[in-house]
Amino acid sequence: LKYKSITYDPEPSTIGVKNGVSQLEFYDHFISEHKNSKKIEEYLIKSDIDFFLNNEQTAKEIDLTGLKGRLYPLANETDLIVFSPMMWGYNYIVSQNFIDSLNEVQVSDEDYTIYSVDIENAQNRNYYLLFIPIIPSNEVDYVNSILYKRLRSNASEKKYITISNFQEYNDLLDDYPFYDFTQLALPSTYKSKHILNIQNHVDLFLSDELIDSLQSKNVTNLVIKKHPKLVIQDHSL
């Protein structure tokens, strides 16, 4: 499979609001009213990434069905909705159109989990929180990845860097925290997955097949990015 990363469009012309980061809020009182409020707070909102990764299966199985949210005034309804507060593993609320594409390309049930949510002021009643397991940074194939230091300069001045392992990556970040990948590599264990969520990489990676399906349905608030390139090795590390 070949992949591209996706993001959302922060412009008011698409999401309706000017904050650029969120169309909807799961307000504190909505969370506190939910039957699993304590687990939501403990595992998804207030935890750090290490706690989450160590308890990811438990976090994934927290039933969020019926969690109430509210669109901000002027926010548009789109097929991908960005929301607050941040919850580990949940990048977007998605519409039935998005779910139909997951089914169309036969994305494995092991690769995602959905829970229907109640958006009080939405016209469309079929929205879902989409959980994608996070691939830990220590599973990235750093030998075949390429990084560059993020500078206030044009692309021609980028200095590309190759490293050998996860420890070298951590050492780089300790020295200078602003590195981006121009190529990101994963081991062969991930080669059949249509949707990937990698630690320290904000955007999801989708297979070209899944992207084609989403675009055929005119899914809104979906932005396809050219970089970084994702490669999955044919052999195990």
Language model feature labels by segment:
Residues 86-147:
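Extracellular-facing segments of soluble proteins and assemblies that are Gly/Ser/Thr-biased and enriched
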Residues 2, 7-13, 88, 135, ...:
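Short, flexible beta-strand-to-coil junctions
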Residues 67-70, 86-91, 101-108, 170-173, ...:
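Short linear motifs at secondary-structure transitions and domain/linker junctions
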